[in-house]
């Protein structure tokens, strides 16, 4: 009799995805981040569900309800800080996952890559709306500033912003709808993750060499299950160190002050994982131009398959492209730093130069270096 795991309609899907899946024999630790993102998503949905049981999405009580969760609910402080810092871990894994895809040329799987970019947008939207929910000063002013950017859209901008707000400013209606969207989006993300995996399993995984690995495959279980478990343990270790020792390390002290529309904080800035995009937004003096640059800074990822000029898929054997890649990483660190600084000299000019370099590397330098490396292959 055949094993139930290979015959049962539901179990065989799991079997083909996580047990008998043929995987390349040489994928490194950089391939762990997919499973880590899955774990992050599960942690966020579970902690978020328990937070939603005690949270109230009303401007009068939202801040107090979060305080109540931390003070009065059993282990409420733990759930709240796991959720807040879980978001940071989520983005660390996301950035490393995308970086891996860029370095090893995984973007040549068009559908998988494009759904991944859509997922990135969805996670960013979810995180933004989640940041508004505690209704602290930075929640309120962050929501005001970011939603206000849509008013830069010609003709329909102002109407659109008021429609999103549900009034003439960020208020009760805004908070209620943000809570509703923040609750539903992770489930949409989960569905998209399944589609992401569906397309990935159509082609099979890429590997560090960028070469076809059909002739050398190993079963996912036990080799990569045990490897993923190690990654998960390390992820949970880092998350719990963050939560239990310095839960407010990545947060903003301003968010411990209840939202006050009459008092603007001296420096309005988003969470650390949005700072690079925020720096790009601020580096353009024109409102519409800034908004376009902000959207394009993420949307540009969709152009990578088109801009791939090299005859090799991975950067493993392309030292010049490697140098440019790491300059891009350094540039993103610079943008993240600038995004958290006040708008004054010399930060303005550094931000503008870093923003120009970001788009230059992706649109011009990397493709040009790739073409040059193709020439070197013939020497």
Swiss-Prot record:
The note on cofactor binding and number reads: Binds 2 heme b groups non-covalently.
Q: Which UniProt keywords apply?
A: Electron transport, Heme, Iron, Membrane, Metal-binding, Mitochondrion, Mitochondrion inner membrane, Respiratory chain, Transmembrane, Transmembrane helix, Transport, Ubiquinone
Q: What is its main location?
A: mitochondrion
Indicate which residues the UniProt annotation says bind heme b b562. 83, 182
GO CC, alphabetical: mitochondrial inner membrane; respiratory chain complex III
Consequence when changing residue 233 to F = In strain: Isolate MSB 53282/NK 7980
User: Where, per UniProt, does this protein localize?
Assistant: Mitochondrion inner membrane
* Protein topology in the membrane: Multi-pass membrane protein
User: What GO biological process terms are annotated to this protein in UniProt?
Assistant: mitochondrial electron transport, ubiquinol to cytochrome c
Q: Which Pfam families match?
A: Cytochrom_B_C, Cytochrome_B
Please give the start and end residues of each transmembrane region.
33-53, 77-98, 113-133, 178-198, 226-246, 288-308, 320-340, 347-367
Query: The organism sits in which domain of life?
Result: Eukaryota
GO molecular function list:
metal ion binding; ubiquinol-cytochrome-c reductase activity
Residues where heme b b566 binds: 97, 196
What this protein needs as a cofactor is: heme b
Role description: Component of the ubiquinol-cytochrome c reductase complex (complex III or cytochrome b-c1 complex) that is part of the mitochondrial respiratory chain. The b-c1 complex mediates electron transfer from ubiquinol to cytochrome c. Contributes to the generation of a proton gradient across the mitochondrial membrane that is then used for ATP synthesis.
Fill in the subunit field for this protein.
The cytochrome bc1 complex contains 11 subunits: 3 respiratory subunits (MT-CYB, CYC1 and UQCRFS1), 2 core proteins (UQCRC1 and UQCRC2) and 6 low-molecular weight proteins (UQCRH/QCR6, UQCRB/QCR7, UQCRQ/QCR8, UQCR10/QCR9, UQCR11/QCR10 and a cleavage product of UQCRFS1). This cytochrome bc1 complex then forms a dimer.
So what family is this one in?
Answer: Belongs to the cytochrome b family.
Q: What else is known?
A: Heme 1 (or BL or b562) is low-potential and absorbs at about 562 nm, and heme 2 (or BH or b566) is high-potential and absorbs at about 566 nm.
Q: Which PANTHER family match?
A: CYTOCHROME B
This chain's protein is named: Cytochrome b
């Amino acid at each position: 009799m055949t094993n139930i795991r290979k015959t049962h309609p539901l179990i065989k899907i799991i079997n083909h995805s996580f047990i008998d899946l043929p995987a390349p024999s040489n994928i490194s630790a950089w391939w762990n981040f997919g499973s880590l993102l899955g774990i992050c998503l599960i942690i966020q949905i579970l902690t978020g569900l328990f937070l939603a049981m005690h949270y109230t999405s009303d401007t009068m009580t939202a801040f107090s309800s979060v305080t109540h969760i931390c003070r009065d609910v059993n282990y409420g402080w733990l759930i709240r800080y796991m959720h807040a810092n879980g978001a940071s871990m989520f983005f660390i894994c996301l950035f490393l996952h995308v970086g891996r895809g860029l370095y090893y040329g995984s973007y040549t799987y068009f559908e998988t890559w494009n759904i991944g970019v859509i997922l990135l947008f969805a996670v960013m939207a979810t995180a933004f709306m989640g940041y508004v929910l505690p209704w602290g000063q930075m929640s309120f002013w962050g929501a005001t500033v970011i939603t206000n950017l849509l008013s830069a859209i010609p003709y329909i901008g102002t109407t659109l912003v008021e429609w999103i707000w549900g009034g003439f400013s960020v208020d009760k209606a805004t908070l209620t709808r943000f809570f509703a969207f923040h609750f539903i989006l992770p489930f949409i993300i989960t569905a998209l993750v399944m589609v992401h995996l569906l397309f990935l399993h159509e082609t099979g995984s890429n590997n560090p060499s960028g070469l076809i690995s059909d002739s050398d495959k190993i079963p996912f279980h036990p080799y990569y299950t045990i490897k993923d478990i190690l990654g998960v343990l390390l992820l949970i270790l880092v998350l719990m160190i963050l939560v239990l020792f310095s839960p407010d390390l990545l947060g903003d002290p301003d968010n411990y002050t209840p939202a006050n529309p009459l008092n603007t904080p001296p420096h309005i800035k988003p969470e650390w994982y949005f700072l690079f995009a925020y720096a790009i937004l601020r580096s353009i003096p024109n409102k519409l131009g800034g908004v376009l640059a902000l959207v394009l800074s993420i949307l540009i990822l969709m152009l990578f398959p088109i801009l791939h000029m090299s005859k090799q898929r991975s950067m493993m054997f392309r030292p010049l492209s490697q140098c440019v890649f790491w300059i891009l990483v350094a540039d993103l660190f610079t943008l993240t730093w600038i995004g958290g600084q006040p708008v004054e000299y010399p930060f303005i000019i550094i931000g503008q130069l870093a923003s120009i370099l970001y788009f230059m590397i992706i649109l011009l330098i990397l493709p040009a270096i790739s073409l040059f490396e193709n020439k070197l292959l013939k020497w």
